[in-house]
Amino acid sequence: MDAFNYRGGELFAEGVALSAIAERFGTPTYVYSRAHIEAQYRTFADALEGMPHLVCFAVKANSNLGVLNVLARLGAGFDIVSGGELERVLAAGGSADKIVFSGVGKTREDMRRALEVGVHCFNIESTDELGSRLQIVAAELGVRAPISLRVNPDVDAGTHPYISTGLKENKFGIAIADAEDVYVRAAQLPNLEVLGVDCHIGSQLTTLEPFIDALDRLLALVDRLGDCGIYLRHIDLGGGVGVRYRDEEPPLVADYIKAVRERLDGRDLALMFEPGRYIVANAGVLLTQVEYLKHTEHKDFAIVDAAMNDLIRPALYQAWMDVTAVRPRDTAARSYDIVGPICETGDFLAKGRELALEEGDLLAVHSAGAYGFVMSSNYNTRGRCAEVLVDGDQAFEVRRRETVAELFAGESLLPE
């Protein structure tokens, strides 16, 4: 579904005009659609109906409590990578026993807290996490820690190198060539309980082949482990299903799940997925206002009140984000670079966009629901945006805008 549509010459989020949101909450503001989030989650859940499964939303994509609560109400699980994300999920009403704890840098304190609340399992990223960390922490608490090994299948996801995570040179996971030995070691540790196998080969994948290649390699490993007397209960295929930003043609989730289920036919394995971008990317826009237009001999600039500190994907990944006027004009369009107030040449949201603009116009940067606010910063001492969640014809502020005073409230001067 597309939650952002024009009505009477104006862009709406579900049943709320974006201009009304700007008037009420100001700009820049992230705007999310509850209906879109729910529809995307159900695409996964419905395709898995009839078999044991858990769809764990990747909290790193969008960690707003309002967004997490929408998913918790649907019965979603959650994929986390820090103690902070654990506390967010719990505060949002998520069930601890539906949380998988991933990440290469889990601290002992993180592990202890996760064991105390009873997470579903830890996705182990290295051998050092086993004996020298998790085994010791679990023994101190007198419990068995449920684990899954994150196996690196050495599959090229064919995506941006910063978000490709399944190659042998990446920092993530345990090399598939070493995995069997690590499983044998884990099975011998008294305070660990081996549950499954996990992999995540990258983000924003637009073909099925890398997923299926990785799955086939994991299933071969599952068979070898069975020969050793180690029987796994689940297989976690991570996230990575791409979305449409411009002209991509990502695979349908139904086709992906169908191919996976065919390969698992006859196997007693539950299926787990960790989608993030797929669920929230196109559920959100960044709403921004044109401060003024700057025309030079070589370029035309639309200087807006949002900047790279609010949305860093274009600067960091050279990501293409669609930009449209909230109230399109009938006048002649010009090619504009959409730039912010940050003191960096790399501070841009889009380049070379054909738009008819005037000072004060509102723009919507689309597909901003994933890796938007969560990657924002206070660079140039700029307060972070407000976040608004739209539910039908109502808009709710689920995060208020930061004030300048809050930015240095935790700082202090040296004594005289």
From Swiss-Prot:
Residues binding substrate, per UniProt: R277, R313, Y317, E344, Y371
Pfam family of the protein (one): Orn_DAP_Arg_deC
Residues annotated with N6-(pyridoxal phosphate)lysine modification: K60
CDD domains assigned: PLPDE_III_DapDC (cd06828)
Cofactor(s) required, per the database record: pyridoxal 5'-phosphate
Catalytic activity: meso-2,6-diaminopimelate + H(+) = L-lysine + CO2
Biological or metabolic pathway of the protein: Amino-acid biosynthesis; L-lysine biosynthesis via DAP pathway; L-lysine from DL-2,6-diaminopimelate: step 1/1
PROSITE patterns: ODR_DC_2_1, ODR_DC_2_2
Molecular function terms from GO: diaminopimelate decarboxylase activity; pyridoxal phosphate binding
SUPFAM superfamilies recorded: Alanine racemase C-terminal domain-like, PLP-binding barrel
Disulfide bonds: none
Quaternary structure annotation from Swiss-Prot or TrEMBL: Homodimer.
Protein name: Diaminopimelate decarboxylase
Organism of origin: Pseudomonas fluorescens
